[in-house]
């Protein structure tokens, strides 16, 4: 309706021109202009409807708006994705044959896959104790095996609710899985103060993909805290995939100041459900890196 009114207004404004010698050309131009606007409006509406049709859940809270969207429902390619603005926080194929597949930043050739395929505890088929700061949709839980223990630390309760309701990584985890709500560093500090050293074989820090960087997780004191919760040969994995910042330099500097060895693992996606990823491996176990 608004477009039609705008078109009529334009016709009135140009009515004086209709008396000129170029009347036919003016009329033809106006008709073409109106058709172009109507066509653009049609495609814009179609785009808006299509983009909204895939969103199956939306939550708004202190940390912003979270959306769960899906595509190809009812097929083997049925995919659900958790996003915060432009940032993807994980996805999952929902068909039974593929739902345990780790995508986005956690695929076989990502830093996560490399770690689990080469960690001594996994190589010798011993149970692993795993910590993860930042839940996402719980994709890392798909890497757990029977006998493993995996504990997630998540600051946003809404993320935990969406991960548990719309994704199955936590429910389908082969190991024992738990989710602790609250700031990851503060929770780790409280555990240490209570004498609850977690003795992790691997600790993943997965909280830096958004626009706002939780700097308190990147300090020397934070890294010292992480390694107090890791076994002597344990591995710290820091996810630094970010659209705006390259955190590899600061992380390497902090790690080296604490006498640790580092390795940057970058992975280019090989499938459409994978994402480009960058992980920094930090460890005292020199043999694991070299």
How would you describe each model-predicted region?
Residues 1-290:
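Alpha-helical transmembrane segments of multi-pass membrane proteins
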